[in-house]
Amino acid sequence: MTTIQTIGVVGYDKCSEQDTITALEIFRGAAMVLAGKIAPWKLKTPTSTLDVKLVSLVPGNITMQMGTQVVSDAVVGDSDMFDLLYIPGGVGSGAASLDARMLGLIQRHYKAEKIVASNCSGVGILARAGILGKHPVTCVAAVAPGLREEGINVPQPRRMWLGLPEARLWTTTGSYGVNGSTVAMVAHYFGEEIGTICSMMFDTLGGIGQQIYELQGPEFYFHPDLEEKFAAFFQPMLLPPTGNKK
């Protein structure tokens, strides 16, 4: 099993509150379970330390897409590295997908064989970083058509999450899928016992059941007319054109 001791959730201007904080809270919940601070029974899993940080690319507060101001734990430096790098989505993802600092951070981690995960429109940032190749990914409906036009493999129907451990990639749909996907990541990378406890802490097991132990999440419904309208409205903001259509 891949050893994960550090997780960096990257906050940026106009990232989504749900996409960012939901993942951050679940990872920090897992850290508390791993440390033995939350133990509904005598755990078989040995205690361990998991350091989870909300990091930013620049100093100062992070202003999220609905105006929430948050303080990062650290400004990520050129030599900082995390075993798992997590890129959330949000209306600021389009600008982030053109930010050389963000793209360099993702590329540096993937080149170093670290795990890179993302949700919602943040998957577009991974695409612009050039790390997805032909691997199947999932994302929010609003950027799926644009990613397909750029040659990214977004299967239909979309899955709530797609975990690709061998490729060191884990992608997630929009905000609705973040809870289930993050708990599934915990179950996969830290074991079923830790995943089960987190799934009860965050009520995930009651919502989607045994799927949390799988690498693919539940299928999403397809609403072609609505998805076309939402993509037309949001895509210029979330995935600005670069001229790289395939």
Give each language-model segment a name.
Residues C15-T20, T63:
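Short N-terminal binding/cap micro-motifs at the start of the first secondary-structure element
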Residues T2-S16, G29-G36, S48-V55, D73-K246:
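Active-site-adjacent pocket-lining segments in enzyme domains
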Residues I21-A30:
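Histidine-anchored nucleotide/phosphate-binding helix
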Residues G36-V70:
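N-terminal beta-loop-helix "entrance" segment that forms/cooperates
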Residues I21-T22, Q65, S97-R101:
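Generic recognition of short, well-ordered alpha-helical segments
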